[in-house]
Amino acid sequence: MPRAYQRVTDKIFEKLDLEDQLFDRVFYEEVRWWESRFNDCTWNDCKFRRTSFSNGTQFFRCRFEKCRFWAQHTYLGGPTLFEDCEFIECSFVNIQLWNTEFVRCTFSGLFHNLIFYGPEAPEGLETVLRNVDFFGVRMELTDFRTGIDLSTTRMPEADNWIESSIWET
């Protein structure tokens, strides 16, 4: 039987500067990270529910493995930068990616009910993708809209697109 999750609830973490940290089996709920920086950190089997990374939070060379991000009011942006990060067998369900930038990131797992907005979206909604690899993702009800630039993005095979689309503007 796996060990229980450590719970962290209703917290605001500001201006953290962490390097080479391991977070294992943590359930974050109603948690906010603001103006924080993470270098070479790993989250293993963590859950993120109604959480946000925002106000300039940055991730460099971080690894998220078997993590789950879900629920309304779960935000990965506002603004947030992920650079050279790996999301391995992670699930993203009903979350917001507003004002988020992914640079040289790799994903595998599940996207369900996500919208990626391009530069023609209202201010603050754009997601920027630069050299991103979504090849290992199963996309369910996932849309790419408002002129998002996918020219450097590796997309999954057609059989991993379930009711998902790239909208032309």
Locations of the language-model features?
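Tandem repeat scaffolds
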Residues: 1-167
